[in-house]
Regions:
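N-terminal membrane topogenic signal
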Residues: 1-20
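Helix-boundary and loop/linker segments of multi-pass membrane transporters
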Residues: 8-10, 143-144, 297-300, 343
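Residues that form generic nucleotide/phosphate-binding pockets
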Residues: 8-9, 255, 280
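Transmembrane alpha-helices of multi-pass inner-membrane enzymes
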Residues: 19, 25, 373-409
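Hydrophobic alpha-helical transmembrane segments of multi-pass inner membrane proteins, especially
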Residues: 21-33, 43-269, 310-371, 395-399, ...
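Transmembrane helix boundary and interhelical junction motifs in multipass membrane proteins
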Residues: 163-168, 289-292, 304-305, 373-376, ...
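Long extracytoplasmic/lumenal interhelical loops at the membrane interface
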Residues: 265-319, 346
Length: 420
């Protein structure tokens, strides 16, 4: 009876379920360890991690609901999800809530969330539907490329204004989906050339028109005082659109400089956390210091989010960090195996798009933690402490499990036919 009940709940590919639960286990351990600053502010050792566990439980419930949705309903929901994404992105651009200098959140029904998280899934959903609808024996029709660009046009710029790294991540995932969908190489080559030129132009504009926000801040000014001062400033519409240039320029300069920073110039919310993340990695070893024994978590303001992989390396060592990375690789290859068994193109493209989205974001986070790329602000999926992003990522896994169920049913039908 118990086995039957569990079987009805944990449907779909068992390997993906195992990967998900291992990631959640690592998340609970590391968020509890890395949330020392939050526990101090909350005056409770357990409050931050209990809130995180509650979000994971809600995410699992949403995941179970999603995996019971048949693939054809995802296809039917595409225009509505796209419309919702565009409306909420416009909403956040006009009247969104600002945190740490970035206007990325809106409040809906008492819940604060980032519309860009929904927009990522909406773009993957739309791209999968376009690629599947316009597939031919030789690959995707030329019209597929144009339709995908038409869908990207209203969404990517709205995301890019406040979250450049998310826009870049989304574009990379869509490009990989078009590769999988066999979009003509000539079109992809032209797109790649345009993107390279656009990125070069953007970097030039950022370096030319962005200001060094660190140099302009008064000495010894706290983050709270900076935030209050920012709120008092009256910014024009143009300044509100391009205000992130300063942040992008600062991050590029810091990444390229690689020079020692004088103690009086250290910003505990920016410079120090990168330095201490590097110290956390450098002082680790093969086995690590053990869960809960991090020495650098108190000096990294985003130890539970953007830089949690550095804390994982410090506490779990090279072996633990490699194990976590392998979980994402297993998720990607397992989803690829599921996609290869799908009878129709849409669920295959949809599942692979979601897997690429999650794994590419994880790769971004890991590269930031070890200093390979500038700080992006991308959390580590399923491990970093998050809000609605955690729940939405669980929905993405639920959608992959839904595809695995349909592929499994196909295999069972084929097996029954062969037996007959």
């Amino acid at each position: 009876m118990i086995n039957k009940t569990l079987g009805n709940i944990f449907k779909g590919d068992k390997v993906i379920w195992m990967v998900f639960f291992f990631l959640c286990l690592v998340s609970i351990i590391e968020v509890y360890s890395a949330s020392s600053q939050l526990t101090y502010k909350a005056s409770s050792y357990t409050a931050p991690v209990l809130k995180h566990i509650m979000l994971i439980v809600i995410g699992i419930v949403c995941m179970v609901v999603t995996l019971n949705v048949k693939c054809r309903y995802f296809k039917m929901a595409t225009p509505f999800v796209l419309l919702f994404a565009v409306v909420t992105l416009l909403w956040v651009a006009i009247a969104g809530a600002s945190t740490n200098g970035a206007q990325r959140w809106i409040v809906l029904f008492g819940l604060q969330f980032q519309p860009s998280e929904i927009a990522k899934g909406a773009m993957v959903l739309a791209t999968a539907q376009i690629l599947s609808a316009l597939q031919t024996e030789k690959g995707a029709d030329k019209l597929a490329f144009r339709y995908i660009l038409m869908v990207c046009l209203p969404i990517v710029p709205l995301i890019m204004v406040e979250n450049l790294s998310t826009a870049m991540l989304l574009c990379l995932v869509i490009f990989m989906m078009m590769l999988l969908g066999r979009v003509p190489a000539r079109q992809l080559g032209a797109l790649l050339g345009v993107v390279v030129l656009a990125v070069a132009l953007l970097v030039c504009c950022v370096m030319a028109f962005g200001t060094d926000e660190e140099a302009q801040k008064p000495a010894n000014q706290t983050l709270t005082e900076q935030t209050i001062e920012q709120k008092k400033e009256d910014k024009s519409a143009v300044e509100r659109v391009f205000h992130r240039f300063d942040t992008w320029k600062s991050r590029i300069n810091k990444f390229l400089a690689h020079k020692d920073v004088a103690p009086k110039d250290v910003d505990l919310d920016k410079d120090a956390q990168v330095a201490h993340a590097n110290i956390a990695i450098a002082t680790s070893n093969i086995m690590g210091k053990g869960p809960g024994n991090s020495e650098e978590r108190d000096f990294v303001s985003q130890a539970f989010s953007d830089f949690i992989y550095a804390i994982i390396i410090e506490e779990m060592g090279i072996l633990g960090a490699t194990g976590v990375a392998m979980l994402y690789i297993i998720l990607l290859f397992r989803t690829g195996r599921i996609a290869s068994r799908c009878e129709n193109n849409f669920p295959a493209f949809f599942a692979m798009g979601l897997a690429l989205l999650l794994v590419t974001q994880a790769l971004f986070n890991m590269c930031v933690a070890v200093g390979l790329v500038p700080v992006t602000g991308q959390p580590l999926p399923f491990i970093s402490k998050g809000g609605t992003a955690t729940i939405i990522n669980c929905v993405y896994i639920g959608a992959i499990l839904s595809v695995s169920r349909s592929a499994q049913r196909k295999q069972e039908i084929i097996a029954d036919t062969n037996v007959a």
